[in-house]
From Swiss-Prot:
Keyword check for Ion transport: yes
PANTHER family: FLUORIDE EXPORT PROTEIN 1-RELATED
Protein name: Fluoride-specific ion channel FluC 2
One GO CC term, this protein: plasma membrane
Catalytic activity: fluoride(in) = fluoride(out)
Species for this entry: Prochlorococcus marinus (strain MIT 9312)
HAMAP family with a match to the protein in the record: FluC
Length: 122
């Protein structure tokens, strides 16, 4: 990797981290049940991923900046796994089951929405 590639990944990841921390610390959503902020971040990241995939980027610099840098640092798969582990330790198996499917299914729906919207706009 050259210095340009490293700089693009660092730049994208810096903004991904800032955006992630802002959402995790400041956004509270309650729609009858609490959605954890980590889940919200994953939904947004999935939506952005759908948009980026639909754009069919071929510029390597944009891929480094957005896919690897921004989304790589913004999305929180490890936090999602940790939340599942905590639910497992607390023996809250129903919560674990529903949280797992909530995140997977809603993340896929958000991804598809982003992808579909870009297909319409194109």
């Amino acid at each position: 990797m050259d210095i340009t590639a490293i700089s693009l990944v660092l730049f994208g990841s810096t903004f991904g981290l800032i955006f992630r921390m802002f959402i995790q610390n400041n956004l509270k959503i309650n729609i009858g049940f609490n959605i954890q902020n980590t889940s919200i971040v994953n939904f947004i990241a999935s939506f952005f991923l759908g948009i980026l995939l639909a754009l069919n980027l071929t510029n390597n610099n944009l891929l480094l900046l957005f896919y690897i840098g921004f989304l790589g640092c913004f999305s929180t798969f490890s936090s999602f796994i940790y939340q599942l582990f905590v639910l497992l330790q607390k023996r809250k198996f129903m919560h674990l089951f529903f949280h797992y499917f909530e995140v997977i299914i809603i993340s896929f729906i958000c991804f598809y929405l982003g992808y579909y919207l870009m297909q319409i706009i194109k």
